A protein has these predicted regions:
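Short hydrophobic/aromatic beta-strand immediately N-terminal to the Walker A/P-loop
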Residues: 1-2
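P-loop (Walker A) phosphate-binding loop of NTP-binding proteins
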Residues: 6
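Small-molecule kinase domains that catalyze NTP-dependent phosphoryl transfer to phosphate-bearing small molecules
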Residues: 118-176
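Short, amphipathic alpha-helical "lid/cap" segments that border enzyme active or binding sites
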Residues: 55, 59, 175-183
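Switch/connector loops and helix/strand junctions flanking conserved nucleotide-binding motifs
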Residues: 109-116
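Conserved substrate/cofactor phosphate-moiety recognition/catalytic segment
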Residues: 13-63
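Conserved glycine(s) of the Walker
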Residues: 10
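Glycine-rich phosphate-binding loop used to anchor ATP phosphates in small-molecule kinases
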Residues: 50-109
């Protein structure tokens, strides 16, 4: 299962809630980002290369062992390179005949700015602890498309349409409520 959405929408937190009541394992975006930041500056070529390769290898091993993953990531659905990376991460599962699904979370900006400061987020994501920068990043990403929309074509449309997809506004839902809805949908 791939959970998409803007920063601070609750992807990791909802993913944790899904894993707490199912046999899924969580592989959230910052499982890769935080260790690599210790060695390479964010966004540099070696950082980007290793980030992509590590995600891909985790997906390959999970698919080979039948491990059900919740993978969370923020990316731009209108940028072909982002979509190509996403396709490469789900490919090991689809090639093995294993189920792939997408969940697209959305929440109002004011909700995401509040969630940006939660203890669980800051504990798991040291790069978000500079709150002035992190809040600005959440606001910046508000201008980008992080989920598909049937009324606005994007580079991700074909990929997402190839698998079951749930779009869920979790502005007023707890992580547990969102997880319950997602698991019921599955």
């Amino acid at each position: 299962m791939v959970i998409l959405g803007p920063p601070a929408v609750g992807k990791m937190t909802v993913g944790r809630a899904i894993c707490a009541t199912s046999d899924f394992r969580l592989f959230h975006n910052h499982h890769v980002i935080e260790p690599l930041r210790e060695v390479f500056d964010f966004g540099t070529p070696p950082f980007q290369t290793l980030c992509h390769e590590f995600r891909r290898r985790v997906m390959e091993e999970a698919a080979a062992t039948g491990t059900r993953l919740v993978f969370t990531v923020t990316l731009r659905v209108d940028v072909a390179d982002h979509v190509a990376a996403l396709a490469s991460w789900v490919e090991p599962f689809s090639s093995a005949g294993l189920p792939v699904s997408f969940v697209q979370l959305s929440a109002d900006l004011d909700v995401r700015l509040l969630r940006n400061r939660t203890e669980g987020r800051l504990e798991a994501k040291p790069s978000k602890r500079d709150l002035a920068w992190s809040d600005a990043n959440v606001r910046e990403w508000a201008q980008y498309r992080t989920n598909t929309d049937p009324d606005l074509p994007s580079a991700a449309d074909d990929l997402v349409a190839a698998y079951p997809c749930l779009s869920l506004d979790n502005s007023s839902l707890t992580a547990e409520e969102a997880a319950a809805r997602i698991l019921a949908w599955l």
